[in-house]
Curated annotation (Swiss-Prot):
<dbReference type="InterPro" id="IPR020103">
    <property type="entry name" value="PsdUridine_synth_cat_dom_sf"/>
</dbReference>
<dbReference type="Pfam" id="PF01142">
    <property type="entry name" value="TruD"/>
</dbReference>
<dbReference type="GO" id="GO:0009982">
    <property type="term" value="F:pseudouridine synthase activity"/>
</dbReference>
<protein>
    <recommendedName>
        <fullName>Probable tRNA pseudouridine synthase D</fullName>
        <ecNumber>5.4.99.27</ecNumber>
    </recommendedName>
</protein>
<dbReference type="InterPro" id="IPR020119">
    <property type="entry name" value="PsdUridine_synth_TruD_CS"/>
</dbReference>
<comment type="function">
    <text>Could be responsible for synthesis of pseudouridine from uracil-13 in transfer RNAs.</text>
</comment>
<feature type="active site" description="Nucleophile">
    <location>
        <position position="97"/>
    </location>
</feature>
<dbReference type="GO" id="GO:0001522">
    <property type="term" value="P:pseudouridine synthesis"/>
</dbReference>
<keyword id="KW-0819">tRNA processing</keyword>
<dbReference type="InterPro" id="IPR001656">
    <property type="entry name" value="PsdUridine_synth_TruD"/>
</dbReference>
<keyword id="KW-0413">Isomerase</keyword>
<dbReference type="InterPro" id="IPR042214">
    <property type="entry name" value="TruD_catalytic"/>
</dbReference>
<dbReference type="GO" id="GO:0160150">
    <property type="term" value="F:tRNA pseudouridine(13) synthase activity"/>
</dbReference>
<comment type="similarity">
    <text>Belongs to the pseudouridine synthase TruD family.</text>
</comment>
<dbReference type="InterPro" id="IPR011760">
    <property type="entry name" value="PsdUridine_synth_TruD_insert"/>
</dbReference>
<dbReference type="GO" id="GO:0003723">
    <property type="term" value="F:RNA binding"/>
</dbReference>
<dbReference type="GO" id="GO:0031119">
    <property type="term" value="P:tRNA pseudouridine synthesis"/>
</dbReference>
Length: 413
């Protein structure tokens, strides 16, 4: 197995499936280079060009949204505010990449007469429905991607051919954690440990060279306790920082100031901590043996049921996404995973001890990532790719196998 660079290891991704040379290249040179189209369970593609859905009588409105360079959670909050609704009355089937052109369904409670004009957002259709859109109604996403300015085309082609034969590890990708500020999981760990001072330190005192000068100055001011100056400096797009600082400036204690941050954002932090631990689990499982073959103690998925592997049983290897209510593998796999939890100072029950709305249950995730309909084309120094991935899997994990970036942000990740 080829070892990953230090940045990847910081996010729990220790290995590559392919042993090809780094191709280099840049993703997301423009948002149009990274197109994501939601795919419903019945195979319907929510295409950027439009889609026809069959309406149903009910108290929900499904809206076809195409967004460009817009964060999904912030779009939900803006849409709820514009329609005079609670954010709980607006739902999505999944978060989509921000720096991209993405097409998906957003549902809102009740009828909608007029939709607002929002920068970077197009509304292409509306249908009355009997239920909200939820992750369980989504199969996955179709990706159309251009990797530009590839430095070593032969390396790219070698990796792409290898990925036709070899599954990639189903890591959670870079965008789950951040590449300019890779701290989302650290904020989540601070929340799970109920350590508000650590949360503050990570948010404001951990400053990265890749950040803008304005953001650096704002964080420095906040870290020194000058909340008013930090609020002046932070642009409005820094929603969570500004909410936190306003409450601190207003005399709130630190924990209650954190709890004023929109719950959707806090939940992202907690889920990022889950993702980091899963990545560490998967890296350890790769050390134990090939991930396409179960070993004693493994958990496997058979007909959507989770069971302990037994000789001749077959099944697809899964690992727990740690949280309340999940089983751990047995034997040397289970022992290694429990060691990770001890090192991180986390207990699965911590996910259930969070305030209401932030409680996260555990689940299981397949360890192998195999794209459907995978095709690519070399165009000079660019590579065009199209494929479909199941819900929760990351296109950037496949692209990582091709580019093998030491500093992901320099390659558009």
């Amino acid at each position: 197995m080829l070892e990953a660079p230090s940045f990847d290891k910081m996010l729990g991704m220790f290995y590559y499936a392919t042993d090809t040379c780094p191709s280099g290249g840049v993703i997301k040179r423009s948002p149009e280079d990274f197109v994501v189209e939601e795919v419903l369970l019945d195979g319907t593609v929510i295409a950027t060009s439009g889609v026809e859905l069959r309406p149903r009588v009910g108290n929900w409105t499904w809206i076809h949204v195409v967004k460009r360079n817009v964060d999904t959670i912030k779009l939900v909050l803006r849409l709820a505010r514009a329609l005079g609704l609670s954010h709980r009355d607006v739902s999505v089937g999944g978060l989509k990449d921000t720096k991209a052109v993405t097409s998906q369904i957003i549902s809102v409670r009740g009828p909608v007469a007029n939709l607002p004009q929002l920068p970077g957002v197009q509304f292409l259709g509306m249908w009355s429905m009997d239920k909200p859109i939820t992750p369980s109604q989504i199969y996955g996403n179709r990706f159309t991607i251009i990797l530009r300015d590839v430095e070593r085309i032969s390396c790219a082609e070698g990796a792409l051919e290898a990925l036709k034969k070899t599954a990639a590890p189903n890591y959670y990708g870079y965008q789950r954690f951040g590449t300019i500020r890779p701290v989302t999981h650290l904020l989540g760990k601070a929340l799970l440990k109920k350590d508000p001072h650590l949360f503050f330190e990570v948010m404001f005192c951990k400053i990265f060279s890749r950040e803008s000068e304005v953001a650096k100055r704002a964080r420095e001011a906040a870290c020194k306790g000058d909340y008013a100056k930090a609020l002046e400096l932070f642009p409005k797009k820094f929603v969570e920082e500004r909410v936190f600082l306003k409450r601190l400036a207003g005399g709130y204690d630190m924990w209650n100031a954190i709890m004023a941050i929109p719950p959707q954002i806090l939940r992202v932090y907690i889920e990022a901590a889950q993702s980091y631990i899963f990545n560490r689990f998967l890296s350890i499982r790769m050390e134990i043996g090939p991930i396409d073959r179960p070993v004693e103690g493994d958990l496997v998925e058979i007909n959507r049921q989770i069971a302990y592997y037994a000789e001749g049983l077959g099944g697809e290897v899964v690992l727990p996404v740690v949280g309340a209510g999940v089983r751990m593998p047995r034997g040397k796999v289970g022992e290694a995973l429990l060691r990770v939890l001890r090192e991180e100072g986390l207990d699965p029950s911590a996910f259930l001890k969070m305030p209401r709305g932030l409680r996260v249950y555990g689940t299981y995730r397949r360890v192998r990532l195999e794209p459907a309909g995978f095709e690519y084309k070399i165009m000079g120094n660019d590579v065009f790719m199209q494929f479909t991935l199941p819900r929760g899997s990351y296109a950037t994990v496949l692209l990582r196998e091709v580019v093998k970036p030491a500093e992901p942000h320099k390659h558009g990740f």
